[in-house]
């Protein structure tokens, strides 16, 4: 519609991508609305996020994640191109042992500014935080599922022992603060 064109006109790269690949986007994401596509395109590097969805959506819809259109759009809109590519690249590592994350957990982590960094940090720190510090995978995911998830996870790893032993906080309280 005219309103969608106006919204995308502030993002020339996305407008060009949508103009050239709109039918391909609809084929790759058949449940996506015009508003969904414009919502991704309006983001910083939205054109690249749409292009990443075009190339990665097919495999992300299949095992092990089996993401639906809404989940794919959420990652692209909130986490951007780097999150879409990270989820694609690490889908087997994230869902396999020892992490065993669910698709919903992967989407929750990836759907934020810095989602790709949070996913990378979860791969590195989830086993450590669970085995060495007694956190549950759900607690680690909760910490990672916000803007700045990487930094929050690294801070919890560094300060959890001090906060619990020296200051009497429980792990649940530290997770709530993080």
Describe each PLM feature range.
Residues 1-178:
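Non-catalytic all-alpha helical scaffold/repeat segments
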């Amino acid at each position: 519609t005219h309103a969608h064109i106006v919204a995308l006109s502030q993002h020339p790269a996305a407008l060009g991508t949508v103009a050239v690949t709109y039918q391909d986007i609809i084929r790759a994401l058949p449940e996506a609305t015009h508003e969904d596509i414009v919502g991704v395109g309006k983001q910083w590097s939205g054109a690249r996020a749409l292009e990443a969805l075009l190339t990665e959506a097919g495999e992300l819809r299949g095992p092990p994640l089996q993401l639906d259109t809404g989940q794919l759009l959420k990652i692209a809109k909130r986490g951007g191109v780097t999150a879409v590519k990270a989820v694609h690249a690490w889908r087997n590592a994230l869902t396999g042992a020892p992490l065993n994350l669910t698709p919903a957990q992967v989407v929750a982590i990836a759907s934020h500014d810095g989602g790709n960094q949070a996913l990378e940090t979860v791969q590195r720190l989830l086993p450590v935080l669970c085995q060495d510090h007694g956190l549950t995978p759900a607690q680690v995911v909760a910490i990672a599922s916000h803007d700045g998830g990487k930094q929050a996870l690294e801070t919890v790893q560094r300060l959890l022992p001090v906060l619990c032993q020296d200051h009497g906080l429980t792990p649940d309280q530290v997770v709530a603060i993080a």
